[in-house]
Amino acid sequence: LVLDYLVSGKITAGTAPTNTGSKSIEVWAVGSWDGTNWPSVFDGTDSDETVTSADIKASVCRFVAAMACDTTADRSYFFGPVSLAAVFGGTLPPKFVFFVTHNLRTTTPTGVALNSTAGNHQIRIQPVFQTIN
C-alpha cells in the first residue's frame, strides 16, 4: 500500500524569455475523485489543457511548486521533493495528474513556449511505503 509519493522534477524554459517582472513556472496536481472521473477539462492523460479561468484552476488544482525564472534561454528549473499526500490535504486521491503552467514572455505578445525537447522536462514520483518489522 502506497502511503505517499514524493514528487520532484525539472521544467526547462524556451528560448529568449524577457521576463520583465515576476515570472515563474508552476506545477499543480489534479486528482480524480473516483479513479475514473476528472474535474473540468482534465482527463487523466498526458495532453495539453486550457483551464477556463484562474478561479477554476484554484478550485480543482492543488499547488505543488513554483520556480522563479530569469531571462536565460533553455535553463532547467528544478523543484521538490514534495509530499503529494500533503498537497492533497493528507490523503492521496485514487488517481492524479500534473499540470504545468508558466507566464514567461518574449518581446512578442505571443509569449515564449517551454523548451520543445520532451527529455528536457521531467516529473518523477517516488512511492513511500510503510515498513513493518
Regions found by a protein language model. Give the residues of each.
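Acidic Ser/Thr/Pro-rich low-complexity disordered segments
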Residues: D34-C61
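A short beta-strand element within beta-rich, extracytoplasmic domains
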Residues: V2-T18, F98-V100
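Predominantly extracellular/luminal cell-surface or secreted proteins
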Residues: W28-T36, T101
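Short coil-to-beta strand junction motifs in C2/discoidin
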Residues: N19-V27
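C-terminal interaction-tip segments
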Residues: L92-K95, T101-N133
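Extended, solvent-exposed segments with strong compositional bias
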Residues: V51-G90
